[in-house]
Amino acid sequence: MILVTYDVNTVEPGGRRRLRQVAKACQDYGQRVQNSVFEVEVDPARWVALKARLEAIIDPALDSLRYYDLGANWQRRVDHVGAKPAVDLHGPLIL
């Protein structure tokens, strides 16, 4: 599990577009757990692709990305309190 966090400057021109693009890229690979925070479970190849996609979107002079590798036993390292219940990505999907 990788925790992806980002801060995109929306004051400068193009900032809102970059913010939407970063959020969309993260949603394509994981689930939003807070504003600007995503949990992502990917294999190494998909992780390289996501990182490249995100880093191509942001303006490094104005925006930032942070990645936290929580490892394979991430469930034991994450405590959740409050609203927005966690979604079990490995549980059954009911449509």
Swiss-Prot record:
Its EC number is 3.1.-.-. Mg(2+) binds at D7. It comes from the Bacteria. The keyword Metal-binding applies. Keywords: Antiviral defense, Endonuclease, Hydrolase, Magnesium, Metal-binding, Nuclease. One of its GO terms (biological process) is maintenance of CRISPR repeat elements. Its cofactor is Mg(2+). GO terms for molecular function: metal ion binding; RNA endonuclease activity. HAMAP family: Cas2. CRISPR (clustered regularly interspaced short palindromic repeat), is an adaptive immune system that provides protection against mobile genetic elements (viruses, transposable elements and conjugative plasmids). CRISPR clusters contain sequences complementary to antecedent mobile elements and target invading nucleic acids. CRISPR clusters are transcribed and processed into CRISPR RNA (crRNA). Functions as a ssRNA-specific endoribonuclease. Involved in the integration of spacer DNA into the CRISPR cassette. Homodimer, forms a heterotetramer with a Cas1 homodimer. Belongs to the CRISPR-associated endoribonuclease Cas2 protein family. This is CRISPR-associated endoribonuclease Cas2 3.
